[in-house]
């Protein structure tokens, strides 16, 4: 399935939640204090950035969406700095000022791109303050398509059920970045986006992929959510809805410098995409890519449309689906079979994807409902093909394959043959390209023994990765 960015400028979003100011003091450190065993930092840079719900709003604005921001602030200089910070990018602040409370501030001291300490300046807001904020925000619902509740457990979002119900009654989607052990507070929300720790704090320890899906569906039913997107760090994201198969989206982050604000980026990209007309799976793929960009930056950051376009092209070959872990695939395959779908599987190196590959995979997909492509990892290709191979690393090979309309799932394997992974997955039909004899196809006997079939498909003559490489070398 292809992913294309919608017209973000059409998105109209209201963000309600805990706003704060992220303040950074930055400088070199070259000695230890004589007063205590701590480093001395000579501050040469001070920077303020909107954080929390304000960072969500900035992310939406940076992508090109129209956004209003409602939150609780104090009557202080920090509130003024926060106002200037959001207005710079065209965010409309709708503050409720609480005179006897400070605007929440997170002060971080950094040196050599490392955070040394964080100091928090805050007092919890009262329940009455939250009631007033949500009541004030009701007047904004008629001018937006999506609402984001950004809850950092600081008091702005206390009991939002009535607000959620009113928004849904008006046809407005409500997305929630939740906190705490009671997701019932958000009953009726369109989508909640807990990270794995937040999810397990509510449902208990997750022991397997199947257990995660069972627990997520339990929450959907219990609290009348339309969907749950669990963000899982290096395992990517898992989207669970009531009436569709689950969707696993692998992480795209190559280097992680700072996870500050990553959750904000996810929900802001989701909100902007959905408000601009994207469907939920596409919005999740866009959000996953945006998160992969932002964790490669230091401190609370935003992601621009240009960065998102570049990241989608680099990491997905324009596709947000397909690449899964073996465990994720095993469960997805089980569910596909329960739905009566015929699953076809093939394998190969696919080092340089060419017309012969595309034709072959199209033929394979035509034989069933779902197509799995198992791909040799880099070490396996090198053992099979020799020095100088693979030309393309496995993540890029898989990303390109996942971009093909004929391919549903792509999974890597490390052995020289796919015998083990085929034996584990046992597709309905195993196909192989070339002039193989059926009895020589790895995993074929096991598939047949399990009631499946094995079939050989022809390749287009004269097209091969080796021939392409030799032709390139000859013309250098």
From Swiss-Prot:
**Catalytic reaction(s) noted:** D-glycero-beta-D-manno-heptose 7-phosphate + ATP = D-glycero-beta-D-manno-heptose 1,7-bisphosphate + ADP + H(+); D-glycero-beta-D-manno-heptose 1-phosphate + ATP + H(+) = ADP-D-glycero-beta-D-manno-heptose + diphosphate
Recorded GO molecular functions are: ATP binding; heptose 7-phosphate kinase activity; heptose-1-phosphate adenylyltransferase activity; phosphotransferase activity, alcohol group as acceptor
The keyword Amino-acid biosynthesis is assigned to this record:
no
Provide the alphabetized UniProt keywords: ATP-binding, Carbohydrate metabolism, Kinase, Multifunctional enzyme, Nucleotide-binding, Nucleotidyltransferase, Transferase
Gene Ontology biological process terms, A to Z: ADP-L-glycero-beta-D-manno-heptose biosynthetic process
Among Pfam families, the record links this protein to: CTP_transf_like (PF01467), PfkB (PF00294)
Q: Which Gene3D superfamilies match?
A: 3.40.1190.20, HUPs (3.40.50.620)
Q: Which pathway is it part of?
A: Nucleotide-sugar biosynthesis; ADP-L-glycero-beta-D-manno-heptose biosynthesis; ADP-L-glycero-beta-D-manno-heptose from D-glycero-beta-D-manno-heptose 7-phosphate: step 1/4; Nucleotide-sugar biosynthesis; ADP-L-glycero-beta-D-manno-heptose biosynthesis; ADP-L-glycero-beta-D-manno-heptose from D-glycero-beta-D-manno-heptose 7-phosphate: step 3/4
The entry marks the following residues as binding ATP, namely 195-198
Per the UniProt record, which EC number(s) apply here?
2.7.1.167, 2.7.7.70
Entry keyword Transferase? yes
Q: Which domain of life is it from?
A: Bacteria
What is its quaternary makeup?
Answer: Homodimer.
Q: What does this protein do?
A: Catalyzes the ADP transfer from ATP to D-glycero-beta-D-manno-heptose 1-phosphate, yielding ADP-D-glycero-beta-D-manno-heptose.
Query: Could you identify this protein by its name?
Result: Bifunctional protein HldE
Lineage, highest ranks first: Bacteria, Pseudomonadati, Pseudomonadota, Gammaproteobacteria, Alteromonadales
């Amino acid at each position: 399935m292809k992913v294309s960015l919608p017209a973000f400028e059409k998105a109209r979003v209201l963000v309600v939640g805990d706003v704060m100011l992220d303040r950074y003091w930055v400088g070199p450190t070259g000695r230890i204090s004589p007063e205590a065993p701590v480093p001395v930092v000579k501050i040469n840079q001070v920077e303020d950035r909107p954080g929390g719900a304000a960072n969500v709003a900035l992310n939406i604005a940076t992508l090109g969406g129209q956004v209003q921001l409602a939150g609780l602030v104090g009557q202080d200089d920090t509130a003024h700095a926060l106002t200037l910070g959001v207005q710079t990018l065209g965010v409309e602040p709708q503050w409720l000022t609480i005179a006897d409370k400070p605007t929440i501030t997170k002060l971080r001291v950094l040196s050599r791109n490392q955070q040394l300490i964080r100091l928090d300046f805050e007092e919890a807001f009262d329940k009455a303050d939250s009631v007033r904020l949500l009541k004030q925000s009701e007047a904004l619902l008629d001018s937006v398509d999506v609402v984001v509740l950004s809850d950092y457990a600081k008091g702005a979002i206390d009991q939002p059920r009535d607000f959620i119900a009113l928004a849904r009654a008006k046809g407005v989607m409500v997305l929630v970045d939740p906190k705490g052990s009671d997701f019932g507070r958000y009953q009726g929300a369109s989508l909640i986006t807990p990270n794995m720790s937040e999810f397990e704090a509510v449902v208990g320890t997750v022991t397997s992929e199947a257990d995660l899906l069972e627990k997520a569906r339990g929450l959907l039913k219990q609290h009348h959510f339309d969907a749950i997107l669990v963000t899982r760090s290096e395992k990517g994201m898992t989207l669970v809805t009531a009436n569709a198969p689950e969707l696993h989206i692998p992480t795209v982050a190559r280097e992680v410098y700072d996870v500050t604000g990553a959750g904000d980026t996810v929900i802001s990209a989701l909100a902007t995409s959905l408000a601009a007309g994207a469907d939920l799976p596409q919005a999740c793929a866009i959000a996953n890519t945006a998160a992969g960009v932002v964790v490669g930056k230091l401190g609370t950051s935003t992601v621009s449309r240009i960065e998102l376009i570049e990241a989608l092209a680099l990491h997905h070959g324009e596709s947000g689906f397909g690449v899964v872990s073996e465990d994720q695939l095993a469960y997805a395959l089980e569910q596909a079979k329960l739905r009566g779908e015929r699953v076809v599987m093939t394998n190969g190196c696919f080092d340089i994807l060419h017309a012969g590959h595309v034709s072959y995979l199209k033929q394979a997909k035509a034989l069933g409902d779902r197509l799995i492509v198992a791909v040799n990892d880099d070490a396996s290709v090198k053992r099979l093909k020799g020095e100088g191979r693979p030309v393309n690393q496995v993540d890029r090979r898989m990303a390109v394959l996942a971009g093909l309309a004929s391919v549903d799932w792509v999974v890597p394997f490390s052995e020289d043959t796919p015998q083990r992974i085929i034996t584990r997955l046992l597709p309905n039909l195993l196909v192989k390209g070339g002039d193989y004899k059926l009895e020589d196809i790895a995993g074929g006997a096991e598939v047949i023994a399990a009631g499946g079939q094995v079939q050989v498909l022809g390749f287009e003559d004269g097209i091969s990765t080796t021939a392409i490489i030799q032709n390139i070398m000859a013309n250098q």
